[in-house]
Amino acid sequence: MPNEIFTINLNAQAIIPEAFILLGIVGTLLVDLAGEKTASKWAPIICYLSIGSSLLSLALQWSNPVESAFLGSFNSDNLAISFRAIISLSTLVSLLISWRYTEQSGSPIGEFAAIVLSATLGAMLLCGSTDLISVFISLETLSVASYLLSGYLKRDPRSSEAALKYLLVGSAAAAVYLYGSSFLYGLSGSTNLATIGLEIINKPSFITSLALVFVLSTVAFKIAAVPFHQWTPDVYEGSPTPVVAFLSVGSKTAGFAFAIRILSTTFSSFDEEWKLLFTILAILSMALGNVVALAQTSMKRMLAYSSIGQAGFVMIGIVSGTQDGLSAAVLYLAAYLFMNLGAFSCVILFSLRTGSDRILDYSGLYQKDPLITLGLSLCLLSLGGLPPMLGFFGKIYLFFAGWANHQYLLVIVGLVTSVISIYYYISVIKMMVVKEPQEASEIVKSYPEINWGIVGLPPLRVALYTCVAVTALGGILSNPLFKLANTAVSETPFLQDIIATANNIS
């Protein structure tokens, strides 16, 4: 009988998507041992099979989610499935745009792919973790792999500096999380997030508030919210560009998934407190991220500060707490996947051809490379929230949900900072479409001949076309995507209490 109960509670099928990613890690490491030539041929194929199988198993789980697995430490509900799908897709696109970059830098492809898949594994597990211990293991799996990726260009001192900064700040964030977790365990005697929430519901105290602050600090670090953002610009600038692309979407999505789960279960009785703190973080992130981005001269640093501002927009949906607000947050993260990785695809392609990251060097690019100009322009317009791009509809859903829940200040700040962001996005576009040849940068004047036949460029081309197409077809895709996000939220049991509370306030 005990063995029967254990088997029922284990529900190992919940992590089949993660199991495929794990097989991919093993496979890429094995081909890496066989030599660089073998790894270059087989590592991409193994990654595609691994991620494709993971996405397929997530799709099959959609109609039959596993509510509790591994003795209550993991939950494969529809919300977790949605976030894990976004992370898997972000990994797939990040790998597609990384093969040529990795080969040109002289780094081992099999080893690189294994570390990216390891980070993906940690991020996906974090989305469904429902126990303090499983959260920490997932968090550290993601973090350690991210540190390795940031410093992957061993010959580049900026990459080593980025890895060291990321390691130091990330270690501090992990220590803060453990300290907050120790308070929660001491107050409740349990490590299960839902059980802790039930135990502390009648125990409002200074210790509980301190635990909330510590946990929120960890969340803010993962999503790069102000004032826990200091690592972001330096790490983004120094890390390999494909790594930055993955961190900007995959790591951030995992952070938001963790935030929604722990705030809605463990701290559901402290919703006024955490919503106030989240409101402050959102306002600071939108304001500082978009204002400081105006002064950047590096494309990667500009996108780093842009990502800080984008995190603030997502927080509007979470603070609203309504079904529409949470659905809009999921939708916007899905939209952010395509428009941000589309922009990074163009940045990587330009960097491969010129070796430059300076915004000024994009001057006159339209004359030499219309494809990069068009793709980057569409993605930047979408990030700015201009119609009819996908980003416009994502922001509209977020702002409507916030306004309906009386989050007027957040919505007004969001609108103002969106206008600011449009200015620096359009400045880049204007620079690229300079008409007079003499106004083009020296880099563009000596632009190399475009050759898509080079090894590693066809996958990058596929990623670029896909991201730009999805971003540009926002008007058609926004409604079905929102319906999927709405289904994920409405069919996730632990969210219903916070939604009911938000509806009562409205």
UniProtKB/Swiss-Prot annotation:
Major subcellular location class: membrane
Membrane topology classification: Multi-pass membrane protein
Location(s), subcellular: Cellular thylakoid membrane
Biological process, per Gene Ontology: ATP synthesis coupled electron transport; photosynthesis, light reaction
Catalytic activity: a plastoquinone + NADH + (n+1) H(+)(in) = a plastoquinol + NAD(+) + n H(+)(out); a plastoquinone + NADPH + (n+1) H(+)(in) = a plastoquinol + NADP(+) + n H(+)(out)
Domain of life: Bacteria
Gene Ontology cellular component terms for the protein in this record: plasma membrane-derived thylakoid membrane
Family, per entry: Belongs to the complex I subunit 2 family.
Function: NDH-1 shuttles electrons from an unknown electron donor, via FMN and iron-sulfur (Fe-S) centers, to quinones in the respiratory and/or the photosynthetic chain. The immediate electron acceptor for the enzyme in this species is believed to be plastoquinone. Couples the redox reaction to proton translocation, and thus conserves the redox energy in a proton gradient. Cyanobacterial NDH-1 also plays a role in inorganic carbon-concentration.
Subunit structure: NDH-1 can be composed of about 15 different subunits; different subcomplexes with different compositions have been identified which probably have different functions.
Protein name: NAD(P)H-quinone oxidoreductase subunit 2
Source organism (scientific name): Prochlorococcus marinus (strain MIT 9215)
Phylogenetic lineage: Bacteria, Bacillati, Cyanobacteriota, Cyanophyceae, Synechococcales
